[in-house]
Amino acid sequence: MKLLASPFLLLLPVMLMSMVFSSPNPGVARSHGDQHLAPRRWLLEGGQECECKDWFLQAPKRKATAVLGPPRKQCPCDHVKGREKKNRHQKHHRKSQRPSRACQQFLKRCHLASFALPL
């Protein structure tokens, strides 16, 4: 009986920690994964107002037009930062040419949607 109880007692703290870190209650504990929910939440709430095909065809930037009604959110890939003016401290202040995390998730979702077969 003692042999069966000792492995269970060793696994008990691990199980409790995994339950605490995966808790949906934000007041209990937050794991590092919770920090990345904001872009995903933005995408799930319908923040995407652009079409996937625009990004895969490398369409030119759309001009902002005045639209009556509630303001629309822009595509997450509209704000990719370009190169900045060179300065003498360029090595220390390089900006990443990578798109933002929200843009990467948007492109990944569009890419996966392009593989989806119509029913």
Swiss-Prot record:
The processes (GO biological process) annotated in the record are: angiogenesis; cell differentiation; chemokine-mediated signaling pathway; macrophage chemotaxis; negative regulation of inflammatory response; positive regulation of cytosolic calcium ion concentration; positive regulation of ERK1 and ERK2 cascade; positive regulation of macrophage chemotaxis
Q: Which cysteines are joined by disulfide bonds?
A: 75-103, 77-110
Of the GO CC terms on this record, one is: extracellular space
Residues of the site described as Cleavage = 63-64
Q: Positions of the region Disordered?
A: 75-100
Keyword check for Cytoplasm: no
Q: Name one GO molecular function term.
A: chemokine activity
- Describe the processing and modification events after translation: Likely to undergo an endoproteolytic process to form a four-cysteine-containing mature peptide with a canonical CXC chemokine scaffold after secretion.
Q: In which tissues is it expressed?
A: Detected in lung, trachea, lung, tongue thyroid, submaxillary gland, epididymis, and uterus tissues and at a lower level in ovary, prostate and in intestinal tissues.
Deletion consequences = Mice show no defects in breeding or gross anatomy development, and they gained weight normally but exhibit a paucity of macrophages in the lungs.
**Annotated Basic residues bias:** 82-98
Keywords attached to this entry: Angiogenesis, Chemotaxis, Cleavage on pair of basic residues, Developmental protein, Differentiation, Disulfide bond, Secreted, Signal
Read off the PANTHER family from this record. C-X-C MOTIF CHEMOKINE 17
Q: What other facts are recorded? A: All the mice injected with NIH3T3 cells over-expressing Cxcl17 develop rapidly progressing tumors within 21 days.
- Would you identify the family this protein belongs to, as annotated? Belongs to the intercrine alpha (chemokine CxC) family.
Protein's name according to its UniProt entry: C-X-C motif chemokine 17
Organism encoding this protein: Mus musculus (Mouse)
Q: What is the lineage of its organism?
A: Eukaryota, Metazoa, Chordata, Craniata, Vertebrata
Gene field:
Cxcl17
